[in-house]
């Protein structure tokens, strides 16, 4: 319940612009969120490994 409430709270427009922050759309994690995907690093990695993100490939050099 607490995580659901925090997701709703983060979705609201803050009174002051600097108070806004991103949350992972999948798990609700507040830190390490990639804005382009709207996912945290953990969810992004899992989904990329499963091939659920088109155009995202594992890089090697």
From Swiss-Prot:
Its function, per the record, reads: Binds 16S rRNA, required for the assembly of 30S particles and may also be responsible for determining the conformation of the 16S rRNA at the A site.
Q: Protein name, please?
A: Small ribosomal subunit protein uS14
Fetch the SUPFAM superfamilies from UniProt: Glucocorticoid receptor-like (DNA-binding domain)
Q: Which Pfam families match?
A: Ribosomal_S14 (PF00253)
Question: What InterPro entries does the record point to?
Answer: Ribosomal_uS14, Ribosomal_uS14_bact, Ribosomal_uS14_CS, Ribosomal_uS14_sf
Assembly mode:
Part of the 30S ribosomal subunit. Contacts proteins S3 and S10.
Instruction: Give cofactor(s), names only.
Output: Zn(2+)
Q: Where does Zn(2+) bind?
A: 24, 27, 40, 43
Comment on bound cofactor: Binds 1 zinc ion per subunit.
Keyword terms, alphabetized: Metal-binding, Ribonucleoprotein, Ribosomal protein, RNA-binding, rRNA-binding, Zinc
Q: Can the keyword Transferase be found in this entry's annotation?
A: no
Similarity section = Belongs to the universal ribosomal protein uS14 family. Zinc-binding uS14 subfamily.
């Amino acid at each position: 319940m607490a995580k659901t409430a925090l997701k709703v709270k983060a979705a609201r427009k803050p009174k002051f612009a600097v108070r806004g922050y991103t949350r992972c759309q999948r798990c609700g994690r507040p830190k390490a969120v990639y804005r382009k995907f709207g996912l945290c690093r953990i969810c992004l990695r899992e989904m990329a490994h499963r091939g659920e993100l088109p155009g995202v490939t594992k890089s090697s050099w």
